[in-house]
A protein has these predicted regions:
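Phosphate- and other anionic-substrate recognition elements at nucleic-acid/protein interfaces
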Residues: 1-124
């Protein structure tokens, strides 16, 4: 399949952790971050260091919101995707595989973002 987004990241977001899988032409790397602000800033720094251009995450409850709010200040295309649009693959049962699957779908341009209002509307 054709690569659409060569430098991308899939995030599997949970209450206490975020698993991030970065895919670049050089390869793939997965890291785990906690959800405290300090840790999310480390995630943002890592994405910048890897020169990521696109980031996708599932719209899991409210846990995606602090990550989205922090990353929207960077020069990234952010996608928050309905979990129903990320079809389950048999045997895909771990958080690491979830992050890799999201990154792979994003890499090939197979994800569509949900509508997220801009910051001023979200703060109303």
């Amino acid at each position: 399949m054709e690569v659409i987004n060569a430098r991308c990241c899939g995030l599997d977001v949970h209450k206490k952790t975020v698993l991030a899988c970065v895919m670049t032409p050089e390869g793939r790397e997965t890291r785990t971050f906690r959800t405290m602000t300090k840790d999310l800033l480390e995630l943002a720094d890592w994405l910048v260091e890897c020169r990521v251009t696109h980031v996708a995450m599932e719209s899991s409850g409210v846990f995606w919101k602090p990550i989205y709010n922090l990353l929207e200040g960077l020069d990234l295309t952010l996608l928050v995707v309905n979990a129903r649009h990320i079809k389950a693959v048999p045997g895909r049962k771990t958080d690491v595989k979830d992050a890799q699957w999201i990154a792979d779908l994003l890499r090939h341009g197979l994800l569509r973002s949900s509508y997220i209002p801009d910051r001023s509307q979200r703060e109303l």
